[in-house]
């Protein structure tokens, strides 16, 4: 591995740095965007059961808010459960926007890495080409220099794509996951509002 890094030259280091950041972000988002963490199945029914038993007590609100993003949304609704339907819905929407923003955390960075990695690889390619052509004039010059320039160009191009392709795949996956989870939370919040106001059984 170290021999590859040496052959790729100094332009490879920004790509290595970007790959480490991308890997860390991918692992963090895989862990944080799990269904069981964001919007557990059956949470609304459990919250409504607790509401019927204890009412909208501060303990219930605090307990619900600690159950992840969906819990925060439902807690906002419970805090206004005795208010008119539009007020309760507005409170849920306000918190919902904040929760949706939190779910998208780090995705901009991951998307930027996916877009920039090929450009960093292209930069390494240009550096390698400069080394190749810069070593041409003198007759009988060291043949190792052009070979090193070729390796710099090819390794950086390849590594740029290696970083960019998985980053883009996971970026698209996480965007779709966030949209799906946001829709799920919206449906659960609507269910809470309708059940709390007797509009649904």
Enumerate the predicted regions with their spans:
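Residue-level signature of catalytic and energy-coupling elements of molecular machines
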Residues: 9, 23, 59, 74, ...
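Hydrophobic membrane-targeting segments
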Residues: 1-44
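Cytoplasmic-entry segments and transmembrane alpha-helices of multi-pass inner-membrane transporters
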Residues: 108-113, 144-157
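Hydrophobic alpha-helical transmembrane segments of polytopic membrane proteins
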Residues: 152-169
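Membrane-interfacial hairpin junctions
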Residues: 2-3, 135-148
């Amino acid at each position: 591995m170290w021999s590859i890094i040496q052959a790729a030259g100094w332009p490879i280091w920004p790509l290595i740095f970007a790959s480490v950041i991308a890997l860390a972000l991918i692992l963090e988002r895989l862990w944080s965007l799990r269904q069981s963490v964001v919007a557990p199945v059956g949470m609304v029914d459990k919250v409504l059961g607790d509401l019927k038993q204890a009412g909208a007590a501060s303990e219930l609100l605090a307990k619900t808010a600690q159950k992840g993003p969906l819990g925060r949304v439902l807690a906002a609704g419970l805090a206004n459960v005795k208010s008119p339907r539009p007020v309760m819905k507005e409170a849920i929407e306000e918190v919902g926007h904040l929760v949706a923003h939190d779910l998208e955390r780090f995705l901009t960075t991951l998307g930027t890495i996916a877009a920039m990695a090929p450009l960093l690889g292209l930069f390494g390619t240009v550096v390698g080409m400069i080394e190749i052509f810069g070593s041409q004039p003198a007759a009988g010059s060291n043949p190792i220099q052009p070979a090193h320039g070729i390796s710099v160009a090819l390794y950086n191009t390849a590594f740029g794509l290696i970083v960019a392709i998985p980053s883009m795949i996971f970026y698209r996956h996480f965007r779709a996951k966030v949209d799906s989870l946001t829709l799920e939370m919206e449906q659960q919040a609507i269910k809470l509002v309708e059940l709390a106001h007797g509009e649904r059984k």
